[in-house]
Amino acid sequence: MSVSTHLYAPEGMGRRPAAFLRLVFAIMLAVTVASARAVNAPPLPQRVIELAPNLKVQGGGELTFFGISVYDGYYWSPARGWAQDGPFALDLHYHRALDGAKIAERSVGEITRLGYGTAEQRSRWGDEMKRVFPDVRRGDRITGVNLPGGVVRYFLNGNSIGDIADPGFARAFFGIWLDPKSSQLDFRQLLLGEKP
């Protein structure tokens, strides 16, 4: 007795079941990889833990630009969601070298697109970011920590590199990734743990 099995593709797929199954498998693998990133987030630097000891990773993922990997990001918070006034951290692990001034300029562009602040405030925030943001190399890690009172403290590879103290700036800066109108909605969902 012989048993024969056939794979049938959905209506309209013709005779391409193997291609269909490969596509389904690739999608499942991509979702698994994205989920694993959040679970396997590297621990926060010790100095960050000392500032905000109750943070837990909520999600994470990879940000790409036209298919080029820019960085892996992780969102750390005591609870789910974006608690704008509470302590939280955004931890970025860079895959490529980037100029600190260009990072600041891109950030101002995103803040402007989101509608935060006045032109004068955005200009001041841009100057502050240029003062604090270093050039990054592949493998560098920048962690931004939102502290009570609207202070954002930045760390490069675990070492403090500067603060920007302005509640409006804190909301605007973290809004680049966490605002519901972010230009990177898929990445936002990964950071907040809303997308597996």
Which residues are covered by each model-predicted region?
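N-terminal secretory signal peptides that target proteins for export/translocation
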Residues: 1-19
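Short, intrinsically disordered low-complexity segments
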Residues: 14-15, 21, 36, 187
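Bacterial N-terminal signal peptides
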Residues: 22-32
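Terminal leader/tail segments of proteins
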Residues: 36-196
